[in-house]
Amino acid sequence: MLRAKMLGRGPYKPLAILRHMGPLCATRPQHWRFQHSYAEKHSNCARHPLWTGPVSSPGGTQQSPINIQWTDSVYDPKLAPLRVSYDAASCRYLWNTGYFFQVEFDDSCEESGISGGPLGNHYRLKQFHFHWGATDEWGSEHMVDGHAYPAELHLVHWNSMKYENYKKATTGENGLAVIGVFLKLGAHHEALQRLVDILPEVRHKDTQVTMGPFDPSCLLPACRDYWTYPGSLTTPPLAESVTWIVHKMPIEVSPSQLSTFRTLLFSGRGEDEEVMVNNFRPLQPLRGRNVRSSFQVPRVGTKS
């Protein structure tokens, strides 16, 4: 039974590894929205409770998020499919961080994680969270060809072959791998509803609800094509330790599901209520980085 409480971990549960693979992909999503001044109008560099520095890390050359240019990405035939193996029983709790809602996992063993693709080692799952906007016109951190999605999912993993814990991996070279998944409005998402149903219990900052087994691979798109590039965390400490893996195709969620995200608060109990929206970082310059794709990009003028 789910119960709301202040910060703390839930009980341990036995392991049960689940693996998922997806079918062939469409060439290009057919649902683009253009937001002219997304970064300029909706900058929120002061939103994060730990944010005391500038929008960009001082001297940083590999900051995230970025605008992914479809035709400028470079196809890399050496990029294998990403291997995903998440243990549903390692899910611990969902909490309101004061910046977004986040689902935490037991990362003390190797059962939940990813490997393959652009990664040289196994990376353990630590947590996942979402970013979203005040309206359905924007909310994602990354853009594709200048187009924003209403929301973006981030699954955060750390290099357990190179570092002894998540904290050390956060600021270490090749320390983190983050999967990015865009959300678009469409059909009701059955698996996401499990999270949506308990959001009212974590409306305020620093509240938590214990969860039973949950396999986050149910939130991945069927198509596993992706872009990858070297980047950073999008919240403090903005460490440039991240291998980003951004899925080409989004998942569909219903308008009512996304609206429930916007019922959460940045504020804690007893504080003036401040609605949790626009919890994304503005776009950062590419600065000569290569964005590689696991799929071939059709040339202009060719049929998909």
From Swiss-Prot:
Pfam families: Carb_anhydrase. It catalyses: hydrogencarbonate + H(+) = CO2 + H2O. The keyword Metal-binding applies. Residues 35-295 form the Alpha-carbonic anhydrase domain. It is an enzyme of class 4 (lyase). Zn(2+) binds at H129, H131, H154. Coiled coil: none annotated. It is found in: Mitochondrion. Residues 1-34 form a transit peptide. Keywords: Lyase, Metal-binding, Mitochondrion, Transit peptide, Zinc. SMART domains: Carb_anhydrase (SM01057). GO terms for cellular component: cytoplasm; mitochondrion. GO terms for molecular function: carbonate dehydratase activity; zinc ion binding. Its EC number is 4.2.1.1. Its cofactor is Zn(2+). High in liver, also detected in heart, lung, kidney, spleen and intestine. Signal peptide: none annotated. Belongs to the alpha-carbonic anhydrase family. Mitochondrial carbonic anhydrase that catalyzes the reversible conversion of carbon dioxide to bicarbonate/HCO3. Mitochondria are impermeable to HCO3, and thus this intramitochondrial carbonic anhydrase is pivotal in providing HCO3 for multiple mitochondrial enzymes that catalyze the formation of essential metabolites of intermediary metabolism in the urea and Krebs cycles. This is Carbonic anhydrase 5A, mitochondrial. It comes from Rattus norvegicus (Rat). The gene is Ca5a.
